[in-house]
Amino acid sequence: MDMNSRDTLVTELNVLGDFDPIIPEAWQQPDYVMLGNLSPQVQLTTLERLTRKPKLVVMDTMNFWMDIALDDLKAVLKRVDVLTINDEEARQLSGEYSLVKAARVIRAMGPQTLIIKKGEHGALLFGSEGQTFFCPALPLEDVFDPTGAGDTFAGGFIGYLASTGRTDFEAMKTGIVYGSALASYCVEQFGTTKLASITSEDVDARLAQFRLLMTEKA
């Protein structure tokens, strides 16, 4: 079974179809914002209801919104710092097959930093000054369910940045590794089961595996 691709038969928005993001006053001045994969209009409304510009806004989206709300999506892209999408979505949004060319086109739409996820083949980070970083995926013997891996990746990425207070490219490189490490746990069991059971020591152990993978020479 190829878990790097999906065939979406139908998308039902259900309660999210008319979701109105109400932000409590105490949360209206965050330093870091993660716009999850909801409609571009919800994402835009969320930003408009903040009373202070965040240090960093990270956004996730998917091909569904490119199909039905492209203009709204482009409006949100103008207001975010980092976009995270997969390789198929990057090609659709940019109209370019080469991911390097796709990154250039997408960054011109607004987000100065772009993350392109490639499933079991890792992730690419394109920086605001033309920098590029590749983080491999950890080879796993068993992959139970990839659902939620992208959300986990994004959470690990921005969570690391928020914990350090940094937004520079070097910090983002480490954030990519944290996101990849957590996502590698997510796919090992269904839902949040695995993530709910791991400890900080488990995360450190997996980070060590990533460092070994990225530095070991033949």
Q: Where are the predicted features?
A:
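Structural motif corresponding to alpha-helix initiation and N-cap regions
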Residues: 20-21, 44, 66-70, 96-100, ...
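Conserved N-terminal subdomain of the carbohydrate kinase-like
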Residues: 1-34, 49-53, 204-218
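Short beta->alpha connector loops
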Residues: 37-42, 62-66
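Conserved phosphate/ATP/ADP-binding segment of small-molecule kinases
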Residues: 48-56, 64-134
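Conserved phosphate-binding/catalytic region of the ribokinase-like
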Residues: 99-218
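Acidic, amphipathic alpha-helical patches
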Residues: 23, 73, 143
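Short catalytic-loop micro-motif centered on adjacent basic/acidic residues
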Residues: 32-35, 58-60
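Short gly/ser/thr-rich secondary-structure transition/capping motifs
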Residues: 13-18, 61-67
